[in-house]
């Protein structure tokens, strides 16, 4: 055994605590060497071990009769969708790498989540991304956003995977710490699902396949587990470098090997690289592995064991083939011009045994390294932030109301131009949403809807979180995120199936931050339980803060749903003249946390909209029932920007006009009526012959029917009772120009 003895100071510099260093010595029965310390530091980092979050995550609902792979069991969640098929999906972050090197940081985030899907045997069919950036008027933020979007587009387009949707949210708190959350969804037959395990098959060979190994990404896992600082800019070596064309070859070769039944197990080498893949596969299979690092294909010379074990070079997999299938495995990967090299074997003793240069470099129990095994687990101290009570003292009468006529029109156009409302075309046009011929409802609308190849089914997808809401009220804000994601799925006509989450928070050792995290988990869990939605997995990203302060808490919700008959999909907007419009649900608007309050008055304040999850469930059932009966022509979520923005976007997407009267929506203030935001509300379109039946069925559910008006051929938004008339061109100008400056050549 190599004995370059390390000290407590070395451990602290690797991000371990004194207590953790002591625990490592107890596990090994000795002081670790430098390679072993590096392995423990990566595997016990927040990024890999979830040590400060796993106890909270265990409170989330994870049960469903449709589940095929529960949270934490595999690389991604898997759910039965009928006919022998499963949907496989997951969301993950690449926040800190994007802050340092936005193009590669965002691109490799896409690559990593793609590998999580196809290592399970599923072919990715759509991807989404949820982005948070600072004000693009500032040059650095503009650079980060534009380069991140290009990285996402270039990588995904090269793989040939359609983008079905996503979201962008802009706020100053994300200036030094942007968020890039990437989600991928794939489809697989039940009998072709793969697992990240050795399968207990002692003596089987272990192969590394795909790209060569270099020094890129070393310390990537630990880099993602620290606060961003002024020195972070120098940590570019911790950012991985991606090759999407290599990933495409790796995907095809891996899927071919899986479909031909050659493999016992397969694992992506993402965070912590070989360290993670060997330990996780071994622990799951209750075995060990003996690995010779001299056999690893290198792209750089002079790498030592520490560097090889911690390298996060992209587009690599660790596979355990079935005995007798090794040559066939190698032939497949060689056909795709990829490496497939035997580097070791599965052992019975449960230890990860690493050799290089003929010397034993590491000897560690696999179970001691992994989440759910020997990795530490903590529940941190919480303290309710004092500002949460202060913001609730804000009253709408502290700001001037808008007045009917020109003032209202000006405010409407101003909100339409805001970063969080305006057109996403400058972003979505960089993504290929048509590849694979699966798009039914594309990016830029409430939720995406894509055909599932060779079936009559369609897949609905959405990502959602209003970061201002969770900042103002973490419990209700997280509930709102779950409900809005579900709403954006069911307005396509699809039934919500399951949730994946990306929990973006600040330093968990600060009690106020951990309180926000805990409350968001509680809110998310309560909402998912009531809606009957299992949480199938996801990602936790702590330490999202800079010297200027923490980000807003952002528990991004990824949602999938299934429409059994894709011919019954619902449009986001009406397509004919004379269609009746109404809002179904319970309109309880609030200006607290609204886009109006931020854009027009420069404030993030107040109480966020009330939310009743029982009503949300009833509204979901109502929309799905009405659609099944053929009663609806369109449906869209009513949230950011209120009824005023929802009607404006309906005109912009349909090219029609709307004659509306908002008497049924009238509140004590005009700004509250037009721009107040509400949960549990959907704007629907229908033929007039259905009006009374829809009203009756809505009221039977304990919900309300709010008549709006009709579509016209005028291309005008007429709010008759408010005295506002706005043309398509007047709406379109500010809406389209909002993000153009960011992506202008």
UniProtKB/Swiss-Prot annotation:
GO terms for biological process: 'de novo' IMP biosynthetic process. It catalyses: N(2)-formyl-N(1)-(5-phospho-beta-D-ribosyl)glycinamide + L-glutamine + ATP + H2O = 2-formamido-N(1)-(5-O-phospho-beta-D-ribosyl)acetamidine + L-glutamate + ADP + phosphate + H(+). The keyword Mitochondrion does not apply. GO terms for cellular component: cytoplasm. Keywords: ATP-binding, Cytoplasm, Ligase, Magnesium, Metal-binding, Nucleotide-binding, Purine biosynthesis. It is an enzyme of class 6 (ligase). One of its GO terms (molecular function) is magnesium ion binding. Mg(2+) 1 binds at residues 92, 539. Mg(2+) 2 binds at residues 116, 268. Pfam families: AIRS, AIRS_C, FGAR-AT_linker. ATP binds at residues 50, 90, 501, 538. Pathway: Purine metabolism; IMP biosynthesis via de novo pathway; 5-amino-1-(5-phospho-D-ribosyl)imidazole from N(2)-formyl-N(1)-(5-phospho-D-ribosyl)glycinamide: step 1/2. Substrate binds at residues 93-96, 115, 240, 312-314, 541. It is found in: Cytoplasm. Its EC number is 6.3.5.3. Coiled coil: none annotated. The keyword Signal does not apply. Its main location: cytoplasm. The active site is at 47, 94 (proton acceptor). Belongs to the FGAMS family. PANTHER family: PHOSPHORIBOSYLFORMYLGLYCINAMIDINE SYNTHASE SUBUNIT PURL. Monomer. Part of the FGAM synthase complex composed of 1 PurL, 1 PurQ and 2 PurS subunits. Part of the phosphoribosylformylglycinamidine synthase complex involved in the purines biosynthetic pathway. Catalyzes the ATP-dependent conversion of formylglycinamide ribonucleotide (FGAR) and glutamine to yield formylglycinamidine ribonucleotide (FGAM) and glutamate. The FGAM synthase complex is composed of three subunits. PurQ produces an ammonia molecule by converting glutamine to glutamate. PurL transfers the ammonia molecule to FGAR to form FGAM in an ATP-dependent manner. This is Phosphoribosylformylglycinamidine synthase subunit PurL.
């Amino acid at each position: 055994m190599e004995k370059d003895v390390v000290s407590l100071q070395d451990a602290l510099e690797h991000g371990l605590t004194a207590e953790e260093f002591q625990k490592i010595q107890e596990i090994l029965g000795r002081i670790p060497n430098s390679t072993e310390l590096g392995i423990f530091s990566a595997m016990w980092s927040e990024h890999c071990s979830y040590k400060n979050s796993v106890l909270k995550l265990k409170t989330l609902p994870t049960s469903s009769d449709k589940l095929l792979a529960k949270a934490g069991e595999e690389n991604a969640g898997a759910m039965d969708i009928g006919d022998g098929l499963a949907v496989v999906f997951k969301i993950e972050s690449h926040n800190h790498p994007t802050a340092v090197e936005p193009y590669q940081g965002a691109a490799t985030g896409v690559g990593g989540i793609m590998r999580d899907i196809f290592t399970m045997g599923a072919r990715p069919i759509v991807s989404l991304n949820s982005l948070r950036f600072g004000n693009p008027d500032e040059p650095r933020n503009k650079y980060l956003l534009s380069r991140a979007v290009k990285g996402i587009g270039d990588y995904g387009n090269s793989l040939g995977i359609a983008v079905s949707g996503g979201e962008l949210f802009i706020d100053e708190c994300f200036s030094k710490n942007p968020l890039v959350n990437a989600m991928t969804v794939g489809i697989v037959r039940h009998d072709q699902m793969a697992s990240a395990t050795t399968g207990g098959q002692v003596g089987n060979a272990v192969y590394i396949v795909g790209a060569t190994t270099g020094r890129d990404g070393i310390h990537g896992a630990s880099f993602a587990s620290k606060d961003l600082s002024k020195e972070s800019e120098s940590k570019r070596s911790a950012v991985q470098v991606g090759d999407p064309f290599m990933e495409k070859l790796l995907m095809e070769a891996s899927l071919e090997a899986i479909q031909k039944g050659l493999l016992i197990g397969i694992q992506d080498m993402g965070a912590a690289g070989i360290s993670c893949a060997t330990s996780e596969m071994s622990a799951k299979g209750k075995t060990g592995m003996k690995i010779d690092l001299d056999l690893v294909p290198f792209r750089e010379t002079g790498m030592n064991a520490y560097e090889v074990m911690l390298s996060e070079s992209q587009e690599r997999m660790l596979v355990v083939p079935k005995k007798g299938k090794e040559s066939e495995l190698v032939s497949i990967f060689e056909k795709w011009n990829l490496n497939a090299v035997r580097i070791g074997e599965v052992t019975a003793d449960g230890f990860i045994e690493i050799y290089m240069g003929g010397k034993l470099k590491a000897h560690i129990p696999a179970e001691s390294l992994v989440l759910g095994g020997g990795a530490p687990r903590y529940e941190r101290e919480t303290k309710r932030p004092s500002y949460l009570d202060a913001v609730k003292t804000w009253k709408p009468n502290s700001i001037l109301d808008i007045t009917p006529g020109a003032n209202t029109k000006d405010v409407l156009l101003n909100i339409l131009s805001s970063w969080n409302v305006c057109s996403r075309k400058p972003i979505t046009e960089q993504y290929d949403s048509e590849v694979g011929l699966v798009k039914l409802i594309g990016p830029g609308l409430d939720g995406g809807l894509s055909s599932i190849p060779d079936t009559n089914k369609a897949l609905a997808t959405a990502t959602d979180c209003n970061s201002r809401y969770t900042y103002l009220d973490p419990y209700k804000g997280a509930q709102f995120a779950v409900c809005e994601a579900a709403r954006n799925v069911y307005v396509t006509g699809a039934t919500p199936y399951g949730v994946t989450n990306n929990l973006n928070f600040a330093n968990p050792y600060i009690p106020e931050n951990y309180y926000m995290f805990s409350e968001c988990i509680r809110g998310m869990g309560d909402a998912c339980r009531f809606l009957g939605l299992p949480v199938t997995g996801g990602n936790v990203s702590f330490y999202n803060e800079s010297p200027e302060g923490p980000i807003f808490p952002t528990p991004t919700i990824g949602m999938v749903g299934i429409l059994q008959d894709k011919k019954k999909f619902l449009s986001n907007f009406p397509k004919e003249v004379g269609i009746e419009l109404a809002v179904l649900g319970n309109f309880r608007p609030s200006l607290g946390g609204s886009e109006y309050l931020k854009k027009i008055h420069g404030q993030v304040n107040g109480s966020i909209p009330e939310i009743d999850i029982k009503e949300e469930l009833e509204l979901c059932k109502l929309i799905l029932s009405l659609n099944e009966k053929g009663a609806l022509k369109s449906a869209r979520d009513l949230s950011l920007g209120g009824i005023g923005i929802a009607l404006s976007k309906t005109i912009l997407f349909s090219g029609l006009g709307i004659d509306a009267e908002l008497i049924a929506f009238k509140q004590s203030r005009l700004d509250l009526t037009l721009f107040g935001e509400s949960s549990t509300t959907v704007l629907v379109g229908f033929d007039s012959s259905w009006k009374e039946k829809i009203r009756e069925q809505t009221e039977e559910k304990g919900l309300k029917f709010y008549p709006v008006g009709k579509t016209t051929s005028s291309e005008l938004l007429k709010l008759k009772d408010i005295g506002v008339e706005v043309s398509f061109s007047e709406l379109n100008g500010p809406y389209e120009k909002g993000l153009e400056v960011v992506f202008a050549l």
